[in-house]
Amino acid sequence: MDVENGEGQVQVHLKTKQEHYAVPDVPYAIDGTVTTAELNTFVNTLLQQKDGSPVDFDFLVFDEYLRGRLCDHLREKAISFEDAIEIEYVERFPAPEPQDCLLHDDWVSAVKANGKWILTGCYDNTLNIWTNKGKHILTISGHTAPIKAVDWISLDEESGRFVSSSQDQTAMLWQWNVGSNTAECVSVCKGHERGVDSVSVSPDGQRFATGSWDTMLKVWSAELDDAGEGTSKRMKESGVRTPKMTLQGHRESISAVQWMDASTLLTGSWDHTLKVWDLSLEGIKTEISTNKSIFDASYSNLNRLIVTASADKNLRLYDARTNQGSVVRNTYLGHNAWVQAVMWSTTEEFLFVSGAYDNQNKLWDCRSPKAPLYDLLGHGEKVLDIDWTNPKYIVSGGADNSVRVFKSRKAVVESMDTK
């Protein structure tokens, strides 16, 4: 029989790291034409769940999800059909559920969730605070041009601090009194010469970094009483803050910035490069060359990998730890237009989300490059930003003047189980 063409059987071992779903560790003979659907039926038959409810699994064959026939997958990987094949199965991540639509007066270009709050920034120059249940709490004015990025500095029951950046060439530090529901601009951060597209707060909340169309990366104090070195008395009294550090190296706009740890920053740029900066040395530690302008980049502390969003509809995976930094680990196909935003899950090692100009959000597993796990639909215009900081909620903002909130069923169930 011609197994490679789907005829005949393949010897497989079925493995799982979820011990309560383990099946006997013996070789099984299965048809080469099997797909995920047939493998699900086969494993569930072996398990014979006591409550009778089937479990949805995904199947990893040589570190990549099976998305077609097993024989085609093996052929693509140049794996011998004569060898016993190990197949790892994992419980499928449940589909996030649409929960809410938060309507604004203009494009929503920045979103960031924290606890029960959602912070948004808009093209009408305003910031807004919402509950994750969809209640509007506060509109904040101060910027004089569209807001491009926001991030929380600290948050407790009584107060919150956050930073926003704008096309008005500034970043602003804000203090929010939860009880009185009032927000005050503590400092206006000046130093960039063009719009400020990206902002990120350090893990300890003491500093934040900004990336701008002026190609500069700047690091600022996030402390309330620290206006920056060299700041004149007059500027301090007026609430103006200057940067602690300015780093030069990109040739075009810095579209993404993220703290990798307390002394390391990641930036992505329209100049087709990713750069890893060592702040203790005030210089570039690693540079990764890509073949497209980078619109967004996200680093995972769980797997140490970087995923990027670009102008060619694709997402790409990189490892900054290797000497072959320019080599793409994987390319993810699924969007039909520019991918504007991307972010790793903060709790799920292999999962990330993306938002694009095709009006769609997608939830991905980095081991499934051929297709996303789920399409998260709802936006009527292009997606401008996406956030998964709160494990329970995927939040996105778009040119349809709305924020879409999707609830992660797995995170909600896990939080209930720990109570």
UniProtKB/Swiss-Prot annotation:
Keywords: Nucleus, Repeat, Ribosome biogenesis, rRNA processing, WD repeat. GO terms for molecular function: ribonucleoprotein complex binding. SUPFAM superfamilies: WD40 repeat-like. Its main location: nucleus. It comes from the Eukaryota. InterPro entries: G-protein_beta_WD-40_rep, NLE, WD40/YVTN_repeat-like_dom_sf, WD40_repeat_CS, WD40_repeat_dom_sf, WD40_rpt, WDR12/Ytm1. Residues 10-91 are annotated as: Ubiquitin-like (UBL) domain. GO terms for cellular component: nucleoplasm; PeBoW complex; preribosome, large subunit precursor. GO terms for biological process: maturation of 5.8S rRNA from tricistronic rRNA transcript (SSU-rRNA, 5.8S rRNA, LSU-rRNA); maturation of LSU-rRNA from tricistronic rRNA transcript (SSU-rRNA, 5.8S rRNA, LSU-rRNA). It is found in: Nucleus, Nucleolus; Nucleus, Nucleoplasm. WD repeats lie at residues 103-141, 142-184, 191-230, 249-287, 289-328, 334-374, 378-416. Required for maturation of ribosomal RNAs and formation of the large ribosomal subunit. Belongs to the WD repeat WDR12/YTM1 family. This is Ribosome biogenesis protein WDR12 homolog.
